[in-house]
Amino acid sequence: MTRSLKKNPFVANHLLEKIEKLNMKEEKEIIVTWSRASTIIPTMIGHTIAIHNGKEHLPIYITDRMVGHKLGEFAPTLTFRGHARNDNKSRR
């Protein structure tokens, strides 16, 4: 279910403050965050945000096509290591 249009998109306050400060300075630096639930808004475009995936922070460059999505969508938490090998040969 989508979020009500009456409500604003969720963005963590600390993240919003950091982005506004960088926009006023017109500087580019990596913003480190654990807030995977924050929605990408147009003021974030052009910034690099390091999103925590549970183990490390992955730097993600924000483009205009990402607006409206959540930050966590771009930092996968699980790595697929392949299916279990078939051990029929070792059983013989």
Curated annotation (Swiss-Prot):
One of its GO terms (biological process) is ribosomal small subunit assembly. GO terms for molecular function: rRNA binding; structural constituent of ribosome. It holds the Pfam family Ribosomal_S19. Transmembrane segments: none annotated. Keywords: Chloroplast, Plastid, Ribonucleoprotein, Ribosomal protein, RNA-binding, rRNA-binding. It is found in: Plastid, Chloroplast. The keyword RNA-binding applies. GO terms for cellular component: chloroplast; mitochondrial small ribosomal subunit. Belongs to the universal ribosomal protein uS19 family. NCBIfam families: rpsS_bact. Protein S19 forms a complex with S13 that binds strongly to the 16S ribosomal RNA. This is Small ribosomal subunit protein uS19c. The gene is rps19.
